[in-house]
């Protein structure tokens, strides 16, 4: 009986140790259990600023080839990980023919993503407050859009300050565009895309505008600059800006001339290519931009207030004065920007 009792005690001890080990193991697993995931926060805000030596929009300088600053603020709402709603506003310093104080943009849209395809649909409004009208023919009762005594007075090259090039400018150049964009991420290094913008009254010229482009981007491997955290990319765009016929304000005003009551605004091609370097929230971009507009076509399209010399080579039915503008030619752009989001950078 003594031997049997000893065996029973030994078995009981082993069972107790085994049970204790299992319980301890369970306790250990429970002790390192991952915490529940943080609740999904659909709201975010993107914001940033930039400084550049020249503000160029679709191949045409908006700052008279002078430095410009910009800033933006964009609240976002993520319906889910693949659909984002957004609204935003931005500010750019400019030097426009109508002497507008600044460019103020208001925009909004939706960004759905399907795998490698990222879409963007929205409406963009371009506002140019503080402008002045210049047109010696836009006297009250002339029938020209935006006519006023001020238009005539401002157009005087002595008292109004307009160079003696005869160019016209409406007080308000504001307009809006609807747009659709797609970006295709082929892999970690290559992206291609396409854009489409349409306005029924581009730059308030009275002419419709349609812009379409194709884009491409190569992002260098993250190891290109070792462990420095510096990134690099090369990107480019080729686009076409189509334009309709202006209203009477921008006609040649030459009695009997075919374009007296409005000119066919010159459609054109534009392209840019550049290289950029990124570090944390900063991007330094070096870019070349150009168009196929002649100096005479550029003057007719932009009403460049700095155009001061005429040439027979620039004379045409839409530019009878023969003045030429360099606002649409080849230019180099250096831009330093900072881009942040609340979800990523403010936590």
Roles of regions detected by a PLM:
Residues 324-347:
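Outer-membrane beta-barrel "beta-signal"
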Residues 43, 65-71, 100-104, 172-178, ...:
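Residues that define the transmembrane beta-barrel architecture of outer-membrane proteins
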Residues 51-57, 89-95, 112-114, 125-129, ...:
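Transmembrane beta-strands of outer-membrane beta-barrel pores
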Residues 26-30, 37-78, 88-95, 341:
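Short glycine/proline- and aromatic-enriched beta-strand/turn motifs that initiate or cap beta-hairpins
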Residues 62, 91, 97-211, 317-324:
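Outer-membrane pore/translocation modules
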Residues 33-44, 78-86, 98, 113-120, ...:
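Short loop/turn motifs that connect adjacent beta-strands in outer-membrane beta-barrel proteins
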């Amino acid at each position: 009986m003594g031997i049997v009792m000893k065996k029973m005690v030994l078995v009981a001890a082993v069972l107790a140790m085994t049970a204790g080990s299992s319980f301890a193991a369970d306790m250990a697993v429970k002790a390192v259990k991952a915490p529940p995931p943080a609740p999904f926060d659909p709201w975010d805000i993107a914001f940033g600023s930039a400084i550049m030596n020249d503000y160029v929009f679709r191949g045409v300088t908006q700052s008279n080839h002078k430095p410009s600053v910009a800033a933006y603020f964009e609240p976002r709402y993520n319906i889910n990980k693949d659909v984002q709603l957004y609204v935003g506003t931005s500010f750019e310093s400019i030097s426009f023919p109508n002497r507008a104080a600044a460019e103020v943009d208001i925009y909004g849209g939706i960004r759905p993503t399907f795998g490698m395809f990222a879409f963007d649909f929205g409406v963009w409004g371009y506002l140019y407050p503080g402008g002045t009208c210049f047109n010696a023919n836009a006297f009250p009762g002339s029938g020209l859009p935006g006519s006023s005594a001020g238009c005539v007075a401002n157009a005087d090259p002595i008292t109004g300050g307009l160079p003696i090039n005869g160019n016209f400018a409406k007080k308000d150049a504001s307009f809006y565009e609807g747009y659709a964009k797609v970006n295709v991420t082929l892999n970690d290094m290559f992206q291609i895309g396409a854009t489409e913008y349409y306005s029924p009254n581009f730059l308030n010229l009275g002419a419709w505008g349609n812009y379409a482009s194709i884009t491409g981007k190569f992002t260098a491997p993250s190891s290109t600059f070792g462990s420095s955290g510096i990134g690099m990319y090369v990107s480019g765009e080729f686009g076409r800006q189509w334009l309709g016929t202006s209203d009477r304000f921008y006609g040649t005003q030459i009695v009997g001339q075919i374009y007296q009551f409005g000119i066919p605004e010159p459609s054109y091609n534009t392209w840019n290519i550049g290289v950029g370097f990124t570090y944390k929230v900063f991007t330094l971009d070096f870019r070349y931009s150009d168009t196929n507009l002649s100096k005479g076509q550029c003057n007719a399209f932009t009403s460049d207030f700095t155009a001061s010399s005429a040439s027979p080579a620039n004379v045409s039915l839409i530019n009878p004065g023969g003045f030429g503008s360099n606002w649409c030619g080849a230019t180099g752009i250096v831009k330093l920007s900072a881009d942040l989001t609340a979800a990523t950078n403010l936590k």
